[in-house]
């Protein structure tokens, strides 16, 4: 996974750190491209976002919207692998993944 330190990976919750490894594997296995961490705890997010609590990341890959069916398959696989304490949401430009224990 391509990670720019300016994207806010310092102090990520340990559960989110593990997400990066799993997402990297799932995306590379499906698409054979290296995913990008677009945001960790940096950037502007909605009020109350789990990004600010170090419990969310945004991930994309090039080209993001070329094959929408891949986005759905990858999101579904991540939901399966990560379990019910994680939310995986396909946004317009990225996957949003957060640790939100139920």
Predicted regions and their residues:
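Catalytic cores and adjacent binding grooves of peptidoglycan-active enzymes
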Residues: 6-12, 36, 41-57, 61-102
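Active-site acidic/histidine clusters and adjacent loop/turn architecture
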Residues: 1-31
